[in-house]
A protein has these predicted regions:
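Conserved ABC ATPase "signature" region
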Residues: 130-148, 258
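A short, proline-enriched helix->beta-strand linker immediately N-terminal to the Walker B motif
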Residues: 172-176
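Conserved ABC transporter NBD signature motif
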Residues: 66-78
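Conserved ABC ATPase signature
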Residues: 153-157, 161
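P-loop NTP-binding/switch modules centered on Walker-like glycine-rich loops
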Residues: 187, 191-271
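Charged, flexible cofactor/metal-binding loops and thiol motifs
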Residues: 241-336
Length: 336
């Protein structure tokens, strides 16, 4: 086992609505990401993926609140820290974030170099314009971006170039952990390919030490990440290698996700598309027992009464279901 860059232990965070209702969008989540490795997080919209990302970044501003658990980056515990302290001492150097709709994160009235200056001076107020420009030019060159981009306004850049620019600015200080939340959404296929290549280059060059990639597209994670974690209704329901998650999903929800999308990989091209019925539960009042029970074709009475923990198959593969591995495989084989 390699050096652990990010470890999350039993993390729980919640939203408090204006009616004082608790919504546990991240419910007892644990994970590890080793140096040089990438973790993919998949699931439908509303399953807690982006809230988990915000929680890992320490973005605890109302209505989001930290409840319990630990977040450890390269041996340093950041859970429970004041958000302002996290911003000043952690963000950018220890952990960085590429938000959803990152193309809209750039102020259209400022040149790209100004965003770089803001990031660097947050940690080094004495940095000169020359030092900042030299560092930015070097990093942009490594990532295949022209230096001229630094002197351009966002409106002068294409959508794909904006996205790659946001990524470059986010990692300018070489963070140990990069969290990319839907970084290739809303892009054409060519731009998506360039963004994915850029993220791979970041890992291979050592500019970042590890990565979490969030998306609802399991096949995309297969091409980018080493391991995949599937979330549903704020909980982890399956975790394993990228190959296992895509080609051999075990949890009924993971199986349903893979059955509802077109997969270009050889061996899966001819599978019949099937939708996952229903919608995720309302987390203001989550169901007792298995949270997927109302949508599961294999549900039995015990599923709605018993809340099961994660079953461990080996050091990398776990899943949350009342059925054993053998029982699930038999059901899938029989087409039940």
């Amino acid at each position: 086992m390699g050096k652990v860059m990010l470890e999350v232990r039993d993390l729980t965070t919640k939203y408090i609505t204006r009616f004082r209702e608790d919504v546990y969008a991240v419910d007892h989540v644990s994970l590890k990401v080793e140096e040089g490795k990438s973790l993919g997080i998949a699931g439908e919209s509303g399953c807690g993926k982006s809230t988990l990302a915000l929680s890992l970044m320490g973005y605890y501003f109302p209505p989001l609140y930290y409840t319990s658990g630990e977040i450890i980056i390269d041996g340093r515990t950041i859970s429970g820290m004041d958000p302002d302290d996290v911003r000043k001492s952690i963000l950018g150097t220890e952990i960085a974030y590429i938000p959803q709709a990152a193309m809209n994160a750039l102020n259209p009235t400022q040149k790209v170099i100004h965003f770089v200056e803001d990031v660097i001076r947050a940690h080094n107020p004495k940095a000169t314009k020359k030092e900042i420009y030299e560092l930015a030019s070097e990093r942009f060159h490594v990532l295949g971006l022209p230096q001229e981009v630094l002197q351009k306004y966002p409106v002068e850049l294409s959508g794909g170039m904006k996205q790659r620019t946001v990524i470059a600015v986010s990692v300018i200080l070489g963070p140990k952990v990069l969290i990319a939340d839907e970084p290739s959404s809303a892009l054409d296929v060519t731009s998506q390919k360039m963004v994915i290549k850029m993220l791979r280059d970041l890992m291979e060059s050592g500019m970042i030490k590890s990565m979490i990639f969030i998306t609802h597209e399991l096949p995309l994670l297969y091409n980018v990440t080493d391991h995949i974690m599937v979330m549903y209704a704020g909980q982890i329901v399956e975790r394993g290698s990228a190959t296992e998650a895509v080609f051999d999903p075990l949890h009924p929800y993971s199986k349903g996700l893979m059955g509802s999308i077109i997969v270009p990989e050889a061996g899966l091209r001819d599978h019949k598309l099937t939708a996952v019925p229903g919608v995720p539960p309302n987390l203001k009042k989550p169901p007792s027992g298995c949270r997927f029970a109302e949508r599961c074709k294999y549900v039995k009475p015990e599923c709605k009464a018993i809340s099961v923990g994660m079953r461990t198959l080996d050091s990398e593969r776990t899943y949350r279901c009342i059925f054993t591995e053998g029982e699930l495989r038999e059901k899938y084989q029989n087409g039940a």
